[in-house]
């Protein structure tokens, strides 16, 4: 289409969280979704051909009895990861399709705690919506500074660089 640039990505669903990795080169192998150690998982996703950005999606949702930013894994005051290892994802979803069912500002508070802790993590809008009959669609957008005079020919590498730089 002449109206947008397509980018291949993958939502990596694990027992310890949901992540998006992008861009991924066509016909790349699938990431190992059975990894539960985040350091190993981040390394495996970043090893995929073309990947420049990894996002943590819906971090307050329960994933098989694991909540990525739950009190046993995350200090919401200090922004510390209680697992001991630093966070290495590039962005945090701060508006989710389920946000209207809970404290809509909780993820913003979490994100600011991470920033205050010293992490350079971008905030993103909704990563996905699974159920159009229960959740509000299109409630958030993520904007990235990038030349866009030719929407079908966006420089994806530059857009990803600006994304990671929180621009």
What are the language-model segments listed below?
Residues 1-167:
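Extended, charged catalytic domains and RNA/DNA-binding interfaces, predominantly
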């Amino acid at each position: 289409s002449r109206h947008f640039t397509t980018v291949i990505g993958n939502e990596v669903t694990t027992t310890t969280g949901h992540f998006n990795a992008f861009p991924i080169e066509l016909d790349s192998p699938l990431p190992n979704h059975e990894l539960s150690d985040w350091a190993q998982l981040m390394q495996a996703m970043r090893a995929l051909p073309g990947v420049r950005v990894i996002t943590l999606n819906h971090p307050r949702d329960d994933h098989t009895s694991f909540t990525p930013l739950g009190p046993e894994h995350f200090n919401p005051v200090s922004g510390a990861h209680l697992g001991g290892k630093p966070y290495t994802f590039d962005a945090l979803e701060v508006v989710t399709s389920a946000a209207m069912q809970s404290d809509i500002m909780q993820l913003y508070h979490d994100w600011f705690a991470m920033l205050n802790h010293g992490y350079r993590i971008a905030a993103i809008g909704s990563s996905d919506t699974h159920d159009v009959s229960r959740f509000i669609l299109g409630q958030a957008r993520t904007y990235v500074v990038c030349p866009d005079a030719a929407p079908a020919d966006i420089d994806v590498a530059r857009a990803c660089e600006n994304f990671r730089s929180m621009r």
